[in-house]
């Protein structure tokens, strides 16, 4: 059934933060199989409204919860997709194409099939199975999983273990389980000089040489050597703006944006202080003014592998005959919210085609993911 579920889910044009009916489809399906469900819409304005779902079967512990998102990123040029339709699933041999196939409608489809089959085949299991789904993970992630977790806990629900279905695997299904994530902090630096004619540089103060020196130092600084489960923290320049289309004018100002992905040796605040010290030193030397802004969408986190995390890893190894590696690589995810409530793993499909034109998953990979999810439910419940 996971193939049918995936094809149906791809058919919803659920570009973040819209559900476009995807969550309602899952809600109806789970209701038909005895789940208690509730849809909540959060958001400050109509344009920001986010659809969220919590559905649970059973009332006993442990409550094993699948956490995921139905929203997807923009599909780009539709003409470049198979059948010129990213929101109509296209099956070719062992592959299913469509926006969200791996990120992360494929994982949702697999857990839907695994949980419904498990309930059908095991009428007296000891715990509960639940879903927490949102339409706001790819965007601001403000009114999605974070708010929904607080809401369900206020209602008296408790999650004992969560599986976040992000596409975590690198080369084959089962090679990686994420137990943490790097933090992310974005910077915007504006440097103010003095404009003038290029023939009279002594009457101006070009902000660009100062910016070049600053960015060179920042990109070459060694923030750390990396630690267990974490690679080295890394800074990448993402944009440089001058807004000067005239070749004989020295610009008055320039702006640069950069991002740091960091491990748990740092926080956004400590990195901001380190970055500003470098900026302050060079701006003083070049006698220019600066303004630095920064914002962090996520701090880094790591979990000590708990018994349930180790149990999940054993199920992966037993099912797929591959020993998974505990990892923290990749971008941010809603796991950063879930970890405040319960232990978790992130485990899903291959990440290779996520967000790309002609995003696809192999049907054989869907089967492997289904098997892991089903076998874990058998083991833990």
UniProtKB/Swiss-Prot annotation:
Any coiled-coil regions, as ranges: none
CDD domains referenced in this protein's UniProt entry, alphabetically: M20_DapE_proteobac
One MF term in the entry's GO annotations: acetylornithine deacetylase activity
Binding site for Zn(2+) 2: 103, 138, 355
EC number: 3.5.1.18
Keywords linked to the UniProt accession: Amino-acid biosynthesis, Cobalt, Diaminopimelate biosynthesis, Hydrolase, Lysine biosynthesis, Metal-binding, Zinc
Obligatory cofactor(s): Zn(2+); Co(2+)
Pathway(s): Amino-acid biosynthesis; L-lysine biosynthesis via DAP pathway; LL-2,6-diaminopimelate from (S)-tetrahydrodipicolinate (succinylase route): step 3/3
Cystine bridges: none
Binding site for Zn(2+) 1: 69, 103, 166
Catalyzed reactions: N-succinyl-(2S,6S)-2,6-diaminopimelate + H2O = (2S,6S)-2,6-diaminopimelate + succinate
Any Pfam family matching the protein: M20_dimer
Record keyword Transmembrane helix present: no
NCBIfam families in the cross-refs: dapE_proteo, PRK13009.1
Assembly mode: Homodimer.
Family to which this protein belongs: Belongs to the peptidase M20A family. DapE subfamily.
Protein name in the entry: Succinyl-diaminopimelate desuccinylase
Native species: Rickettsia massiliae (strain Mtu5)
């Amino acid at each position: 059934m996971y193939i049918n579920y995936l094809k149906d889910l791809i058919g919803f044009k659920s570009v973040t933060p819209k559900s476009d009916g995807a969550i309602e489809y899952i809600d109806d399906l789970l209701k038909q199989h005895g789940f208690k469900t509730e849809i909540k819409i959060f958001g400050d304005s109509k344009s920001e409204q986010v659809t969220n779902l919590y559905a649970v079967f059973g009332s006993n512990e442990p409550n094993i919860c699948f956490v995921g998102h139905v929203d997807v990123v923009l599909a780009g040029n539709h003409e470049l997709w198979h059948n010129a339709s990213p929101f109509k699933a296209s099956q070719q041999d062992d592959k299913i194409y469509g926006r969200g196939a791996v990120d992360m409608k494929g994982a949702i489809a697999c857990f839907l099939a695994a949980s419904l089959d498990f309930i059908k085949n095991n009428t007296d299991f000891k715990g509960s199975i639940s879903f927490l789904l949102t339409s706001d993970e790819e965007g601001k992630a403000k009114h999605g999983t974070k708010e929904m977790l607080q809401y369900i806990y206020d209602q008296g629900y408790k999650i004992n273990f969560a599986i976040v279905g992000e596409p975590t695997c690198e080369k084959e299904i089962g090679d990686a389980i994420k137990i943490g994530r790097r933090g992310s902090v974005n910077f915007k630096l504006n440097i103010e000089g003095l404009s003038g004619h290029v023939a009279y540089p002594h009457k101006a103060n070009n902000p660009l040489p100062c910016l070049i020196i600053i960015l060179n130092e920042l990109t070459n600084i060694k923030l750390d050597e990396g630690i267990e489960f974490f690679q080295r923290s890394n800074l990448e320049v993402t944009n440089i703006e001058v807004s000067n289309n005239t070749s004989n004018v020295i610009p008055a100002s320039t702006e640069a944006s950069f991002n740091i992905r960091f491990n748990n040796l740092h926080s956004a605040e400590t990195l901001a202080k380190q970055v500003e010290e470098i900026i302050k030193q060079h701006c003083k030397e070049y006698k220019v003014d600066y303004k630095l802004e920064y914002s962090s969408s996520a701090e880094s986190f790591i979990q000590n592998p708990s018994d349930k995390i180790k149990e999940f890893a054993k199920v992966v190894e037993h099912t797929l005959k591959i020993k998974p590696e505990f990892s923290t690589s990749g971008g941010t995810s809603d796991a950063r919210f879930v970890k405040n409530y319960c232990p978790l793993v992130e485990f899903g499909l291959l990440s290779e085609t996520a967000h790309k034109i002609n995003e696809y998953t192999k049907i054989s990979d869907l089967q492997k993911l289904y098997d892991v999810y089903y076998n874990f439910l058998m083991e833990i419940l």
